[in-house]
Amino acid sequence: MKRLVGIFFTATLVVAAQDTRYPPDGSQIPGPGGRSTPDWVEELSEWQMATGGEHEAWLNDLRQWRHERLIRMGYDDTEYRRPELLWTQRNFIQPQMMAEERYFYDPAAGKYTVDRYLDDLDKRYGGIDSVLIWPVYPNIGIDNRNQWDLARDLPGSVAGLRRMVEDFHRRGVRVFFPSMPWDTGTRDVGQPYWSAAAELMAEIGSDGVNGDTFNGMPRAYRTASDQTGHPVTFEPEGSPSADEMLMWNNQSWGYWKYPFAPLVSKLKWLEPRHMINVCDRWARDKTDNLQAAFFNGVGYESWENIWGIWNQIAPRDAEALRRVAYIERQFAELLVAREWEPYAPTLQYGVFATRFPGEGRTLWTVVNRNEYDVGGEQIQVRHVEGARYYDVWSGAEIKPRIDGAGAVLSFAMEAKGFGAILAVLPGVAPRNLDATLAQTRQWARVPLASLSNEWKFLPQHIVETAPTKLPSASPPGMVHVPAGAFDFRVTGIEIEGFNWAGLDVQYPWEDAPRRGHHHLLTMKPFYIDRYPVTNAGFKKFLDAAQYHPQDDHNFLKDWRNGTYPDGWANKPVTCVSLEDARAYAAWAGKRLPHEWEWQYAAQGTDGRLYPWGNSWDERAVAAPYKGRDLPGPADVDAHPAGASPFGVMDMTGNIWLWTDEFVDEHTRSGVVRGGSYYRPQGSMWYFPQAYKLNEHGKYLLMAPSKDRAGTLGFRCAMDE
């Protein structure tokens, strides 16, 4: 304990040794006065950020802190001077895109639709500079495929991925993929994670790696990438826990605080060429995010499809994003200015500006944090005879009021709005200025306030299932489930999403998707397979129907030479997609059960938690497996103690089972039931089990190649 106290005391002294009146608060630095909310009486004049002396003192203090901090870091800016990574300094807008995004891939046509995806973003908010493609969570852990397996299981595998990346490059968009340090329970990749990531990026021609849950990606990633001859950039999700990591993490995300007076990015202050993408994925109103990004001259994570939950950027925010991004792109070289000055003095309360000086011209990004319009004189700047001033946000030249050595600039700002001012010295002709002003002038005709900022959930619909022909007699191998009243109660167990409207699924009788579901159903009689379809049963189908899917990647992955392994005849068939299962059912004159039919057959009418009762019984289920390979499920008849009240077997704990499919404009998903024997260890982020009969899994769908899983099979139903 004494040693620990000594270490703590020494560490405290080291931190305190770098003296500053304005120490960083995490990844952000407070403004002049060190406060983020004003004292309304005593500090009113300070919070106008006028031309008093405190701003200069604050700025000098921050400059000294930066100078000393870079010495302490042994700072080397080599990575920011590398020609092949200079693009990162213009990488302003980046969505995290689910691989299951329907605008990105068309499973019916079997092709990537990159143009459709990008055209939609161009139309809605002005387009993107890069995209983070997300093929892993939340589906990872349903079987033992690791993060790199799931990427390679995307349609077309490596060759298809390379063509898809080229499609993005053709549109000027860079491509990122993630790396997850927490994925330690699935298949062992057999090499360091940084090597696996670097090799995949080189194979497919990708541009960057996003470090999911990383607070700074270790230097080993940089080294491994360089060794492939295909260097990529690194972008940790969290702000680097050690400032030294800034030297090889050219980008990062910003999970920021949003007080009334904007905070300053510590990382950008230390290294102005470091790109931050401000991320606040669950925010429905993006105003704070966009104002903080614009004030700091950094980017934004335009994330809308959050694990299959749609959080669309509303029209007002989308238009603000279009204009913010356009101005940042037009003046990107100014936004990396070494001597940028946050909190440039302003003349109006609640208006905050940042100065970005360059050769012959200077840009100010301005935000109005007030809930009302602000007009008139806004900022006073040092004046040079012959200089011209432009309201870039509105596309107009400003005629200044000259006050001694200063120019006082007047312009209007909307409530919670934005401004951008450009000063141009005499003899300087900025590139494309006329076109830039013409574009922003056109946009300014539509005030942001005229656009809706209302958030709306995205409705879903269930994919209809055609009824079967009525059997003339009780079908062999099926159990008759009688008609009856059924109190259907089930909850989605998605790890994230709170209790949002739009989460989970929307049954035909509901007016919105939601996590919790309850409905009293009048069940018609039907038949359901006593056991899941086995390997032997599926082999009969293949032989009789000569079925072979067009997209056959991962199809019957455990089979060899057209048949299942010895001893697997009575095990449930797995590595079959929803399409494969439907094809079998159609051949057999059956269909897949609706989820509520599956639950009724498993639960009966007494609301029990498990098919056999209300207490967990290890004898009734397959033994759980916690290793990193996938040994295969138990035989379907191995656990008779697991029978349901109607005598249906193997409903829980052996394999997941397909039921209904749900679709909205951007995502398809399958409801899977029963849970499986496979339980990967080491992380809370793996696909959660749903052994209880009042819980279900939501499995995101993209294409058969990726959807097929080693623990996912099916059983069939038939109408009576």
Task: Label each residue range with its predicted role.
Residues 53-109, 135-138, 472, 477-482:
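An acidic-aromatic substrate-binding cleft motif
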